[in-house]
Amino acid sequence: AADRTSSILLLDDSTIVVANPHSHTISFVDLYDQVNGKIEIDVGKSPQTLAYDSALDRLWVTNQAENTLTIISVSDKSVDGQIETAESPFGVVFDDSVAYITNQKSNLIQVFDLNNFTLIASIPVSNSPRGMSLSKNKNTLFVTHFSSGEISVIDTAELSVIKTISLGSRAGLTQAFVIDEGEAVAYVPNTMRNSDNKNLIFDNTVFPFVSIIDLNELIHLRGERIALDIIDKPVGMPLEAALQNSILYVANAASNDLTIIDLKSKKALAHVEVGSFPSGIDISESGREIYIHNSLDGTISVVDTEAFIVSSVIESTVISASSAVLNGQKLFHSSDDTRMSKDQWIACATCHFGGEADNVNWFFPDGLRSTPSLIGATDTGPFHWSGNLDEIQDVEDTIRKLQGGTGLVFGSSNCLPSCDTAEKNAGRSSDLDDITAYLGSLKFSTAYQKSNNKNEVDSISRGRELFFDKNVGCSDCHKPPFYMDNKNHMMPQVNSTSKSLNTPSLMRLSISSPYLHDGSARTLPEVLTSAPLNSVHGVQESLTSQQLTDLIAFTEAIEPPTQMLVEREYSELTVPQKFDSLAARAKVDFEINLEYD
C-alpha cells in the first residue's frame, strides 16, 4: 500500500509504474527490458497519482481533468472500471482497508472502501487539498493544500480534521509531505511568495524552501526551514521529495533539477539536472537508484545515489500533444531556459500552475492585481485586468521585465509605449507562438455533477432571471457564452476614483477567488455588497437578501461552453468488480491522541 501520494511507484525490484498526465495513460515499465517491456494503458484525462493495493493486486489512478478514478488489474494489465469522484481528484493513498482521495477543487477528502468502492465519508477541508502522507501507525493523515501552504491533520478513526498547520500566509505550491518517522518530523517543499513587494523582479518575487514540521507538537518549525537558493542555487518550484536515511531528494519542477540535501548538516550534497518538469520520485528497495518522473518529457531519470549522476533515462510514454503545444507547455512551465527566466527563479507556471490562478494578489506597475486563470484566455481577450495586452504573445514583456528572461524574440518587445498600441508580436517567434498554442489548448475540467436539491436548483433558476434582468444589468457586460464582453469599462472604486478595467469572464467563478481586479473581495457576496452604491456592482439596496443569494447561486453555477470542457475518456463508467463478501469498513470510535508515535 502507498503511504504518500506519488505519480511514480516501484511495484517490485523489476517493475515501475508511472502516471502520464499528458498522454492520459499509465505505463508499466520492466526495468530489465526497457525496450520491449513497456505496457501502456489508457485511463482517464490527466492522470496525476497512483497507489497500489497489494492485497487485491489493484492500482488506483486519479484522473484530475475528468473527476474519476481508474481501477487497474495489475496481473492482467487491464482496466477493471472507473469510479466517479468529486471535483479535480489529485492524490490517492491507502491504509489497510480504505482509499483516501484529495479533490482539489471541491475541497474534500473522499474515503472509499477498497473492497467494494463504497463512499464511506467526505471530509471537508480548506482550499486546494493536494498531496497526502499517512503516518506509520495509520492513525493520522496529513494533507497539503496547494494554494495556501496549509497542512490538514486528519484523525483516520474519526475521519475529521483535528488541526491545521500553516507554513505562513505566503507559502504555496505545496504538494509533497515527506515523513521521517525516526526524527518525528516531516519535510514540505514549497514556494514562498513575496506578495507584499511593490517592485517585483525575477529574484525577489518567489523563494524556494523546504519547511519542517514537528510531528509530536504538530507545529511548523519556522526557524528550521531550508532555503534552497542558499544551500544550493536558485531553483524553481520545489514540488516533490523523497527521503533516504538522512538524505532528502527534492525535485524542482520548473528548473528541471534535483537538490540533494544532507539533513544532518542541512547542506546540499549535490545538484543533478534531470528532464522536463520532474514531478514524482521513488527510491529503489536497495536505495542505490532514485527514479525521477519527468512528466513533460514522458521519461524517467534514473539517478545513481552514490555518484549522484543520471545513469540512464527510460521512456515512459510518447506525449500525444502537437509539437507546438508541447513546446509551449514546456516553455510555460520552465525557469531553466535563460530566455524565459534569469537564474532559474520563476516560470510562468509559478503563478499560473497548469494555466490556472494562484489565488494571490501581486503589485504590478498598474496597481495591485489578482492573478487570473488563463484557461479560455485565447477566447476572452484583451488580456490583463487593464486590458493592455491585445494578444497573448505580448507576454514577451512579462518574460523580460518580471522573469528576467532574455525573451523569445529578437529586438524590441513591441510593448512601447504600450503593448496594445505597438506592432504585433504574433509570428515573430515560433516559441512565443507555441506558448499561445499551449494556452489555447487548455480546457476546463469535466463538469462535476451538481446537487439535484430542489431548493438549490430553484435558487439558481431565480438567480438566472435576475442576472439577465435589464434592471439589474449583470448581462450588460457579462454576456454569454463566456460571460464577458471583450471590453474595458470605467469602474467606480470605493475611494471615489475610477479605473479602466477589462470585463472578466465568470466561468467557474466559484473556484477563482479572490475577486475583482485587486482581489479586494474575498467572497462573491463581497463583490455585490462592498461596491459603491449605484455602481454596476452596487446592487445591494435594489435587491433583497434572498435575491442576492439567488444571484450568487447562479453565478457560481455558470459553466463554460461544451467545446471548452475536457471530454471524458469514457462516455459511461464501468463499476469495477466488487468483493461484496468483504464488508465495507465500519466507522469506529477512537480517542484522539495528539502525541505522534
Predicted features and spans:
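Periplasmic c-type cytochrome electron-transfer domains
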Residues: 135, 147, 154-156, 172-202, ...
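Beta-strand-rich domains and repeat architectures in extracellular enzymes and scaffolds
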Residues: 1-25, 236-239
